[in-house]
Curated annotation (Swiss-Prot):
Gene: coaX
Positions bound to ATP: 6-13, 128
Substrates-to-products reaction catalysed: (R)-pantothenate + ATP = (R)-4'-phosphopantothenate + ADP + H(+)
Keyword terms of this UniProt record: ATP-binding, Coenzyme A biosynthesis, Cytoplasm, Kinase, Metal-binding, Nucleotide-binding, Potassium, Transferase
One Pfam short name: Pan_kinase
Protein name (Swiss-Prot/TrEMBL): Type III pantothenate kinase
Organism: Thermotoga maritima (strain ATCC 43589 / DSM 3109 / JCM 10099 / NBRC 100826 / MSB8)
């Protein structure tokens, strides 16, 4: 049994698998575990007896302050050193200026895509930030980063005197008739329009590539963005392939 961890800025996903094909997963707020013992206290009731079967731990983390917690947790409770996802040449070539700057979650996504779906495609991951990644002939060619939905609505709320904090959901109208509708239209639909523009431009240059959609916020706009593949486990699959796959 393998324990796979995707440490994000807002939430962290913990998943167990035996074969890299079927996954059980749980989502925790990243801020709830500040020590290895706190992490154990949250995970033990969820994993139960499966904790005794863990023989390897793989981690993709974009929150450096949590890495020590994960390391100590792995050593104390499993006597295992975790394997950390990072950009390195192997099944994927990293054709960017500084591969070390590519987030571990994006590395995992790209590895999973190449292993499971092919060597050419566009990956959209919608979380705290929204990322776009391009893979051509098994080579990572770069991408784009946009603010995520909740980052945008909280920024408007904190950065202004009167704008409210609104629910994040799609707008089914052309223009908003009140402040809440204006924000929803700008944040959610505006993000979709931006992604459509980026995807469209990529396809103009690289051809009609398939799009895979993933990430905790992707369900909000799943029906608004044209895509060929929806895989909410893409990042976790990538952690498995990177750390324990062939």
């Amino acid at each position: 049994m393998y324990l796979l961890v995707d440490v994000g800025n807002t939430h962290s996903v913990f998943s167990i698998t035996e074969d890299g094909k079927t996954f059980r997963r749980w989502r925790l707020s990243t801020g709830v575990f500040q020590t290895e013992d706190e992490l154990f206290s949250h995970l033990h009731p969820l994993l139960g007896d499966a904790m005794r079967e863990i023989k390897g731990i793989g981690v993709a983390s974009v929150v450096p302050t949590q890495n020590t917690v994960i390391e100590r947790f792995s050593q104390k409770y499993f006597h295992i050193s975790p394997i950390w996802v990072k950009a390195k040449n192997g099944c994927v070539k990293w054709n960017v200026k500084n591969p070390s700057e590519v987030g571990a979650d994006r590395v995992a996504n790209v590895v999973a895509f190449v292993k499971e779906y092919g060597k050419n495609g566009i990956i959209i991951d919608m979380g705290t930030a929204t990322t776009v990644d391009l893979v051509v002939n098994g080579s990572y060619e770069g991408g784009a980063i946009l603010p995520g939905f909740f980052m945008m609505v909280h920024s408007l709320f904190r950065g202004t005197a009167k704008l409210p904090l609104v629910e994040v959901k799609p707008a089914d109208f052309v223009v908003g008739k009140d402040t809440e509708e204006n924000i929803r239209l700008g944040v959610v639909n505006g993000s979709v329009y931006a992604l459509e523009g980026i995807i469209g431009r990529i396809k103009e240059v690289y051809g009609d590539l398939p799009v895979v959609l993933t990430g905790g916020q992707s369900k909000i706009v799943k029906d608004m963005i044209k895509h060929e593949i929806f895989d909410e486990d893409l990042t976790i699959k990538g952690v498995y392939h990177f750390c324990f796959g062939d």
